[in-house]
A protein has these predicted regions:
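Conserved catalytic cores and adjacent C-terminal regulatory segments
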Residues: 1-203
Length: 203
């Protein structure tokens, strides 16, 4: 049983519209409550085209594909959902974890047979980073960053050399991530301190 509210992002296959699959009821008039199991939500949010078939929920028969097609960095959705669930409450810690930067200059897209697919993947990764930058520039994100409660971690080198289906290269991903965390030591310490303060306050 899920104790705290959770959601994942998915995309309606028929309309290509982004949706949230929640573990709780939403009363927002423009949002739909989908009845699904955890494993169905997990399949829906990760049903990346070319790798997995679209996922259909057994209850509603709604069909979904990868949530990253629209919401590869759902930081704004997280903030909005939290404010809807707990009106007037403040934020103690927000940790946003990216999937790694992609350098489009290092990819010769014109020489690839699946040009459009690869370009889409690159755009998604770049948009994720742009969304993070946009968030810290707007009033909401700037306030949370200055208050020391918003932290963003996103491996900035090497991840773009590992394709989605290259599970054999997990050691490379580990190495790139460890190197990034070493370079980001001070920010990581601030994040840990913020989380520890939150845990101590609960006791």
């Amino acid at each position: 049983m899920l104790t705290f509210p959770r959601f994942v992002c998915a995309t309606r296959a028929q309309t290509v519209h982004p949706v949230l699959l929640r573990s709780y009821i939403t009363w927002q008039a423009t949002e739909e409550n989908y009845d699904c199991f955890i494993w169905e939500a997990a399949k829906a949010t990760s049903a990346a085209p070319l790798f997995f078939e679209p996922t259909q929920l057994r209850a509603s028969k709604a069909t979904f594909v990868d949530g990253a097609l629209h919401l590869n960095n759902p930081i704004s959705e997280v903030i909005n959902e939290a404010k809807s669930l707990w009106p007037g409450a403040g934020f103690k810690s927000i940790v946003s974890i990216g999937t790694g930067w992609i350098d489009p200059k290092g990819l010769e897209l014109s020489q690839l047979k699946i040009h459009n697919v690869v370009k889409t993947c690159v755009d998604l990764a770049i948009n994720s980073h742009k969304e993070a930058q946009k968030f810290v520039r707007d009033d909401r994100g700037k306030e949370l960053s200055q208050a020391g409660v918003y932290f963003r971690f996103d491996v900035d080198r090497g991840i773009d050399t590992v394709a989605l289906d290259q599970w054999q290269k997990l050691d490379d991903v580990d190495a790139f991530t460890e190197a990034y965390l070493t370079r980001s030591g001070s920010e990581l310490e601030r994040c840990a301190h913020s989380l520890c303060k939150e845990e101590t306050a609960r006791r």
